[in-house]
Every structure is written in C-alpha cells, then in structure tokens.
Amino acid sequence: MSRFISTFRSSSAQLSIVLAVILATGCSQPTTLQEIREEGVLHVITRVAPSIYYQDREQDTGYDYELARLFANELGVELRVRVADDNSEILSVLSRNYAHVGLAGLTQRPDFDNQYRSVPIGVSAQSVIVYHKEVPAPESLEDLASETIHMLADSNHEHLIADPANEAGPIIQKHPGLDAAGLLARVESGEFGYAAVASNELDLNHVFFPKVYEAFALNEPSDLVWLFPAAQDDTLVNAAEAFMERVNNNGTMAQLAERFYGHLDRLNYVGARTFMHHVENRLPRYQSLFKDYAQESGMDWRLLAAIGYQESHWRPNAVSPTGVRGLMMLTRTTANYIGINNRLDAEESIEGGARYFRMVHGRIPDRIPEPDRTWFALASYNVGFGHLEDARRLAESAGKDPDRWMDVKEFLPLLAQKEWYTKTRFGYARGHEPVVYVQNIRRYYDVLVRITEPDAPSASGLEDQLAWLGDNEAGPEAPAKESQPDLRADLPPELRLIPPTL
C-alpha cells in the first residue's frame, strides 16, 4: 500500500510538472495576428466575381480584393489569394481554419454564428427574385407557389425562401456549377423562369441581360461581410474591424464603392452631345500628336484618336484605381515595356498607345484579313491577348470561324461565366467589355472619319444624327443603322443583347 501511495505521489508530481509546462506553453502561443506577421502572409480564399475578385488587364482587382490588399499592406504582409470554385469551398476551407479570411460576397446568416466570425465591408445587398420578362411577374413568394426558383449553392437566399411547413411553396433548385452571370444568362434565354440573386451581383450584370426583370426583395439590405474561422482568436478580427473603420472614415471605402458599384466601369458611355463637344474642344489640342504617332505606327490617326477617346475621353491626367493612367490608359508594365516614362504626359501617352497598338496588331495572325484583324487587335488591347485566344478557341470548338470577328464576339461574353471560363487557359474575363469596346471605337472612328473628310458636316451639325451614341448604347434598345443587318439574329439567345456593330 505504501508503495502504491509513493508511486501515486511520484506520478502526480510528474503530471503536475507536465501540466504546468503545457499551460505555460499555451500562454506563450502567438496570436493569430502574430502568426500572420511572423509568416509575412495573409491567406485569403475567394471566388471569381465582378463584385469580389477578378483580373482586369492582367491585374488582380475587385472591391473585396482591393480592400484585402490595403489591409495586408497595413499589416505589412503579403496578400496570398486562393481562388475557390464556389462558396461551398470557401466555407469548407474556413471551417477547417485553412485560411485567415474568406471573401465570399455573403451577408451574415443565422447558421454562421457558431462557425464563422464576420466583419462588415461597407457594402450592403439583399436577396432579390428575378424573372424572364415573358413569364408572369410575381409580387410575393405566394405567387411562386410550386414554381422553381433557381439559385447558386451556399447563397444567402435559401433560408429566406424555404418553409418546411408550406408544402405548396416554391421549389428550390441550387446550381453548384454556376456563378451569377451564368444564372442570369439562363433566365435571359428563358431556360429558367425565376431565380434568386444578390442585388449587388444583379446590379453589376443587369446591363447584359435586358430580358431579366427584378420582381421583389426577400429581405432588407444587409451588410456584406468578410468571414473569419471561429477557431481564430480575436486579434485578426479586431484588426480588420479597426481597418474598416479607418478606410470608412478617410473616404477610401467610398471611393472603392463608387468605382465598383457606383457605375458599370466601361459599360456606361457618353452621349452624342458630349462626344461632339469633346471633338470640338479637346481633340484639337492632341490632333497633331495623334497624326504624327499614328503615321509612325502605320495606322489611321482617327482610329488612334478613337481609342484615346474610349480610354479617357482625351483626358491626359486620367487615373484608374488599378494604376492604369494617362490619355491612353497604359498600365505601368506596358509603359515600361515600350519605353514610356511619364504616362500622364499626353505626348508620351499617345506615342505609347500607338506603339502598343502596333505591337498588339502584330500579334494577330497575318492570315486574318482587314478589317477583322484590327477589330481583334482592339479587343486584345482591351481584354488581353490570352483572353482573346481563349474566345477564338471556344469559337473554333463550336464550329465557328476563329478568324472572323463576327463569330468570335459571340464567345467573348462567355468568359464571364464560370461554366465556360473554367475550360479556358486564361480563365475569367469581363468578356462583354471588349465587344462593346470594339463597337464604340468603331462608332467614334466612323464619326471622326466623317467630320474630317472634305465637305464634311460640322461637329455640331452631326449631334442630332448621332442618337446611336446615346447614354444607353450598350443596352438592348440601341438602334443600328438601317442599312446594316442585325447580326444578333445569329447569336445564342443569352447574347442577343449585344448591339450590332457598324
């Protein structure tokens, strides 16, 4: 018995020492924020969406991404981005504490309380029901009894619609393989009659889908949030909350919200009156530069001027939050490559734009005849050569001619839909933009040619004839010239909203 007591006391003493060491070690463990600073990396997981994260001219951008980049800079660490297939993957990774922050474009949900912590990011959204214009317009969920409502997987909408007690309620159909653009495209084509989407994603995509109408909201606007694993301590969440408060107070958050949500970037265009005013008042300052550098590059100066107008409205001090700047809106990488030192100098910018367009034009295969080769070059100037090649490959795989702009422009918008861009080499792109970009430059060029020819009408005299340069020219009601066929008849239904080019 005494031996047992002695052994027990000895074991107890050893156990006490071990426990003391464990407790001491636990107390000295670094916090989440300390671990991030020691590693020098902030790990975020996100998905591709125009409201969250995407690449524009080969640069990462997006509202959530820009905030995360600023946050990482403030912490003095590298931002490392992992791109998930969908929200289900983001939530799974966070639940296992395999990332520091999740950028999912979600609002706080009841089922998040015990799994994730959240920090508002200064933008709100609500769940809305949309429908194809040719189906009955619903006013409430009661009008959708026994109808199918389509939505993305792990979205905010299901818990607002599902009612186990109501067997006659709407049928919920979730689509893990789709993104918001793909969902809206199916409503546009009539494949889906009704869908639930986030209002911010509808706002950013609605211009492309004019047959998709908004019916009603399922809830009041709620803050979009960043999500943090519940397994973390408070330090990173507290730092994020303090950061959000600072960027809100200093105006940075408002600037980002205006850029990504206040307008549709390149998809809202000035009307004829403004364009002709700039032709008369701005163009003369730079016309000789356009002529000189266009001649050096072997191109029509009016085409170079049209590119400049589309890029900056001929403003030499134009600056984008992504770092693109100057009259021709050159990236720093492009400027360095072609030997331009000051992008805000009008002459250097025009010279750089002419050089760069000549380089881009030279990459387009010689076998492609004009003017298609120029249209391809313009699209590449806007969206990048890699994305253009992706669209050409998609066109070829569908039995279309990859050397015809009329064929390839059908496939560029598909690069914004997950089911398509995941099959390409260069991934997501806002593929509608180069289509409208080329269209507008052709229109501006056509006007410049007309007013610079002998016996041409004055700029002011053309205003009333240029209704097709109106504010909504990217929308479905933009008329084409009567002498031109409507090429939309040959497009897939979800792409017929793209106005015909001149």
Swiss-Prot record:
* Subcellular location(s) of the protein: Cell outer membrane
**Cross-referenced PROSITE patterns, in alphabetical order?**
PROKAR_LIPOPROTEIN, TRANSGLYCOSYLASE
What EC number(s) is this enzyme filed under?
A: 4.2.2.n1
Where is the stretch described as Non-LT domain? Answer: 34-264
Q: Which SUPFAM superfamilies match?
A: Lysozyme-like, Periplasmic binding protein-like II
Which InterPro entries is this protein grouped with? Lysozyme-like_dom_sf, MltF, Solute-binding_3/MltF_N, Transglyc_AS, Transglycosylase_SLT_dom_1
Record: active site: 311
Listed GO CC annotations: cell outer membrane
GO biological process entries: cell wall macromolecule catabolic process; cell wall organization; peptidoglycan catabolic process
The UniProt annotation puts the region (Disordered) at 457-502
Which keywords has UniProt assigned to this entry?
Answer: Cell outer membrane, Cell wall biogenesis/degradation, Lyase, Membrane, Signal
Q: What is its main location?
A: membrane
Task: Tell me what topology the record assigns in the membrane.
Answer: Peripheral membrane protein
Residue segments, region LT domain: 265-502
Similarity remark: In the N-terminal section; belongs to the bacterial solute-binding protein 3 family. In the C-terminal section; belongs to the transglycosylase Slt family.
PANTHER family found in the cross-reference section? MEMBRANE-BOUND LYTIC MUREIN TRANSGLYCOSYLASE F
Q: NCBIfam families this protein is in?
A: PRK10859.1 (NF008112)
Main function: Murein-degrading enzyme that degrades murein glycan strands and insoluble, high-molecular weight murein sacculi, with the concomitant formation of a 1,6-anhydromuramoyl product. Lytic transglycosylases (LTs) play an integral role in the metabolism of the peptidoglycan (PG) sacculus. Their lytic action creates space within the PG sacculus to allow for its expansion as well as for the insertion of various structures such as secretion systems and flagella.
In the UniProt entry, what is the domain comment?
Answer: The N-terminal domain does not have lytic activity and probably modulates enzymatic activity. The C-terminal domain is the catalytic active domain.
Record protein name field: Membrane-bound lytic murein transglycosylase F
The record lists the organism as Marinobacter nauticus (strain ATCC 700491 / DSM 11845 / VT8)
